Amino acid sequence: MAMTVNTNVSALVAQRHLNSASEMLNQSLERLSSGNRINSAKDDAAGLQISNRLETQMRGLGIAVRNANDGISIMQTAEGAMQETTQLLQRMRDLSLQSANGSNSAAERVALQEEMAALNDELNRIAETTSFAGRKLLNGQFMKASFQIGASSGEAVQLSLRNMRSDSLEMGGFSYVAAALADKQWQVTKGKQQLNISYVNAQGENENIQIQAKEGDDIEELATYINGKTDKVSASVNEKGQLQLYIAGKETSGTLSFSGSLANELQMNLLGYEAVDNLDISSAGGAQRAVSVIDTALKYVDGHRSELGAMQNRFQHAISNLDNVHENLAASNSRIKDADYAKETTQMIKQQILQQVSTSVLAQAKRQPKFVLFLLRN
C-alpha cells in the first residue's frame, strides 16, 4: 500500500464509519428517549402516513364515544322525568276511577277534580323544566337531534324526544256520546243489534269494526260487550245513561262514522277531542272518559320510554364497538410507530462500541503521515 501525505485514505474511511456510528447512535437515543420508532418522515415515510391515519381515526373514535355518552345522558335524563310523568298519570287514573264510582257526592268529585288539576300542572311543569345543558327535552322543542357516533362522516344516529305536555294531541283522542238516553227499561231489541264503526287509520287505510249486540242487553252490558269485541274503541256509560265511545287520536286520521240499526237508535255524536289537559272528572261520565284518555297517555309515555331504552342499549353497544376498534387500532399503530426498547438498546450499545472503535482507529490513522516524515528524516 502506497504511503501518501495529501490524502489519508485510512483516516477518511475511519471518519466515515465514525460518522455512521454516531448517526445511528443518535437515532437510537432519539427513539429511546421519545419511545417512537418513527420520529420523522425519513425514519419510515410509508409507516408515518399509515400511523397518522390510524391516529386520526383513533381521535375520531374517542370523540364518537364521548358523543354517544352524551346521548345516553340525555336519554337517561328524559327517561327519568318520564318515570315521574307515568306516576302522575297513574295517580290521575286512580282519581278518575274513584270519581266514576256512584258513592261519591258532587262535593267529593269537585275535590277529586282539584287534585286532578294540580297533578296536571305538575305534569306540565316537568315537561317544561326537564333540560340537558340548557336544552329543553320534553316540551316539544327538542324534536330530533343527530348524534355522531362514528369516526367518519355519515355515521350519525337520529334521536327523537316527544312532547310530554298534557295538551299534546298524542295524549288524547276523540270522544262520542249517544243522543238517546237509555232508561232502566232500555234493552237491545231484535232487529236493532247492528253497530258498524268505520274510520281511516293513521296509515290511511280503511278500518271497520262490526258489533252485533246481544238481544236483551242493557246499556251497561252493551258497553261491556263492545269493550270485549275491540281494543281500538272503548265504551262507557255516563250518569244520564248515554253510551260513550272513545278512540285514541293516534289510531285514526279522522273521525268515526256510525251505521247500522243500533247506530240509528243511539245517534252517536262527536263530543270533541279530549286530552289529559282538559279532563273533567266532576261527573261520572267525565270520569269514565278520563280513564280512557289517561290509558292512551300511559301507552304513549310508556311507548316512548321503551324507544329510549332500546336506543340507550344501541348506544351502549356502539360504545363497546368503538372501544374495541380503538383498542385494535392502537395496537396496530404501536406495532408501526412505537420503539422496540430491547432492539434499540442493543442497537445503542452496538453503535457506542463502533463509535469508540472508530474513534480509536481514526486516531491511529491520523498518525500514518508521521511515518513519512520519519522516513524523510532517516
Swiss-Prot record:
A Pfam short name: Flagellin_IN
Highest taxon listed in the record's lineage: Bacteria
Entry GO terms, CC: bacterial-type flagellum; extracellular region
Subunit: Heteromer of multiple flagellin subunits including FlaA, FlaB, FlaC, FlaD and FlaE.
MF GO annotations: structural molecule activity
Presence of the UniProt keyword Chaperone in the record: no
Stored InterPro entries: Flagellin, Flagellin_C, Flagellin_C_sub2, Flagellin_hook_IN_motif, Flagellin_N
Note: V.cholerae is able to differentially regulate the flagellins within the flagellum maybe to produce flagella which are particularly suited for motility within a given environment.
Location (main, coarse): secreted
Keywords: Bacterial flagellum, Coiled coil, Secreted
Protein name stated in the entry: Flagellin E
Sequence similarity: Belongs to the bacterial flagellin family.
Function description: Flagellin is the subunit protein which polymerizes to form the filaments of bacterial flagella. FlaE is not essential for flagellar synthesis and motility.
Entry annotated with the keyword Nucleus: no
Chain segments annotated as coiled-coil in the UniProt record: 98-139, 311-339
Species whose genome carries this gene: Vibrio cholerae serotype O1 (strain ATCC 39315 / El Tor Inaba N16961)
Subcellular location: Secreted; Bacterial flagellum
NCBIfam families, alphabetized: PRK08869.1-1 (NF006466), PRK08869.1-3 (NF006468), PRK08869.1-4 (NF006469)
